[in-house]
């Protein structure tokens, strides 16, 4: 809220190694198929330690039809009974987060970390208000309205 000039947030979301490699591969590939960041971000980042899984039971074509959050959640439960998509991952998706890549994090108990970007201009207003507060949201909106106006004036 104190820096309305920033419009993109990034960070990691972890998928615990308590999920099987098959479930983690399914999650990561579905996220990259349906919720992938823009190409300009993909060109500059690559995973340090990609998750390697053999004998996948899906094709890329299947992923395009499978990748709806409730369905992926059910499939994860089929791979790993009692497990589901991590809550934080689902939350970032509700903010319209986009994934850049996934990498196994050896320093964090072999979790599978996804690099995610959140474009604040695409976050639903109810979440912006929750996280920034009414005044912070107003400042953010005012800043970007002025920025767009300045860009239009200079064009």
Residue ranges of each PLM-predicted region?
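Acyl-donor binding region in acyl/amide transferases
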Residues: 1-113
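Short, highly charged low-complexity linear segments
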Residues: 53-58, 131-132, 151
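C-terminal "cap" of GNAT-fold acetyltransferases
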Residues: 110-124
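Short, basic, helix/turn surface patches
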Residues: 36-44, 124-138
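Short, intrinsically disordered/low-complexity patches at protein termini
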Residues: 33-34, 123-125, 149-151
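Short, cationic low-complexity segments
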Residues: 135-155
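Short, low-complexity, polar/charged sequence segments that are solvent-exposed and flexible
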Residues: 28-32, 118-122, 133-139
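Composition- and surface-driven signal marking solvent-exposed, interaction-prone regions
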Residues: 103-105, 115, 128-132
């Amino acid at each position: 809220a104190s820096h309305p000039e920033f419009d993109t947030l990034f960070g990691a979301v972890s998928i615990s190694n308590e999920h099987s490699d098959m479930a983690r591969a399914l999650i990561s590939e579905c996220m990259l198929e349906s919720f992938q960041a823009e190409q300009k971000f993909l060109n500059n980042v690559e995973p340090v330690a990609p998750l390697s899984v053999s004998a996948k039971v899906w094709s890329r074509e299947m992923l395009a039809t499978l990748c709806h959050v409730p369905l992926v959640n059910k499939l994860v439960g089929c791979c790993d009974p009692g497990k589901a998509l991590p809550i934080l991952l689902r939350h970032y998706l509700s903010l319209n987060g986009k994934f850049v890549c996934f990498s196994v994090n050896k320093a964090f108990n072999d979790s599978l970390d996804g690099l995610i970007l959140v474009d604040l201009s695409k976050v639903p207003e109810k979440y912006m208000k929750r996280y920034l507060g009414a005044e912070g949201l107003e400042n953010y909106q005012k800043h970007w309205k002025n920025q767009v106006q300045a860009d239009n004036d200079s064009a």
